[in-house]
Amino acid sequence: MSLAAKITVLGAGSYGTALAICLARNGHKTLLWGRDDNHVAAMEQDRENNKYLADCPFPENLALEADLEKAVQASDNLLVVVPSHAFADMLKQIKPMLTENAKIAWATKGLDPQTGDLLQNVARTVLGDRVSLAVLSGPTFAKEMASGLPTAISLSSEDDEFVAELSDLLHCEKRFRVYSNKDFIGVQLGGAVKNVIAIAAGIADGIGFGANARTALITRGLAEMTRLGLALNAEPATFMGMAGLGDLVLTCTDNQSRNRRFGLALGQGKEVEQAITDIGQVVEGYRNTKEVYMLAQRHDVEMPIVEQVYQVLYRGKDAKLAAADLLSRDKKFE
């Protein structure tokens, strides 16, 4: 049977749209699914996503679809780009719709909101062992990707053939470089932890602490990420790559990051709910903080930055007090 698309992207937010544009721009027939009929109709009419990614026109070979079953059955290659709290439900919905040779990748950054599990464990629980899985993660702002600015990303899977196929679909010598990484656990973990550290960096800047404090948070945040990774049998080198240090630096230092802007607002005195409302899109780090905190507690891993962000978001702790408590911790070797 001839399939309608080379790859289907599930999720028409800013990031899913940007990835769909990149895939289509590489010459592949790409289908982008969105859950809102009116939003999909507007994108079809405007040939761009004015709601989440304005001024980034769609290539001609990028098609739109609001019917989930049609979207899933249009291709063997599926790329899931939904918020982490919607990931399990999305997989449950599409499971009975999958083609015989379906393979699933995701660019969702986070953990399971109920258990703190890695998304690969969620996927295996829902889908079993038949479907090949892969994850994309790295320092990638949607607007820059969609605009064709140079970008690099990490891609990991336990299926080498799937990695090769996805890499070929995404890689573009002039603007999009894909690095393969065999550390499936580490690549997933980096994308979740960096969101929490970015909130901390934003809080510090919102308070007015300056570049020294921001750099210290990035450095110690990387140490926390690596400690948790080691407890989960990830490779330490992964956290010095695109999915670790790369994504961490990007998200902590640039205001395109919603997590950083969220932290800035908290540091400037806004309440959690108001800060999220003002941003107007999903702030993954809000949920990621609870998920990473749960995972660290389960594995008895010390993560003081994550713990203080958790106290601010979920226990009502004042951001300035949290910062003071971090600074007043006992002296220790690096």
From Swiss-Prot:
Places the protein is found: Cytoplasm
Keyword DNA-binding: no
Annotated catalysed reactions: sn-glycerol 3-phosphate + NAD(+) = dihydroxyacetone phosphate + NADH + H(+); sn-glycerol 3-phosphate + NADP(+) = dihydroxyacetone phosphate + NADPH + H(+)
Gene: gpsA
Active site: 194
Binding, NADPH: 14-15, 35, 109, 142, 258, 282, 284
Protein family membership: Belongs to the NAD-dependent glycerol-3-phosphate dehydrogenase family.
UniProt-listed InterPro entries: 6-PGluconate_DH-like_C_sf (IPR008927), 6PGD_dom2 (IPR013328), G3P_DH_NAD-dep (IPR006168), G3P_DH_NAD-dep_C (IPR006109), G3P_DH_NAD-dep_N (IPR011128), NAD(P)-bd_dom_sf (IPR036291)
A Pfam family assignment: NAD_Gly3P_dh_C
GO molecular function, one term: glycerol-3-phosphate dehydrogenase [NAD(P)+] activity
Function in brief: Catalyzes the reduction of the glycolytic intermediate dihydroxyacetone phosphate (DHAP) to sn-glycerol 3-phosphate (G3P), the key precursor for phospholipid synthesis.
Name recorded for this polypeptide: Glycerol-3-phosphate dehydrogenase [NAD(P)+]
UniProt binding sites for sn-glycerol 3-phosphate: 109, 138, 140, 194, 247, 257-259
Listed pathway(s): Membrane lipid metabolism; glycerophospholipid metabolism
GO CC entries: cytosol
Alphabetical GO biological process terms: carbohydrate metabolic process; glycerol-3-phosphate biosynthetic process; glycerol-3-phosphate catabolic process; glycerophospholipid biosynthetic process
Catalytic class of the enzyme: oxidoreductase
Gene3D superfamilies in UniProt: N-(1-d-carboxylethyl)-l-norvaline Dehydrogenase, domain 2 (1.10.1040.10), NAD(P)-binding Rossmann-like Domain (3.40.50.720)
Protein EC: 1.1.1.94
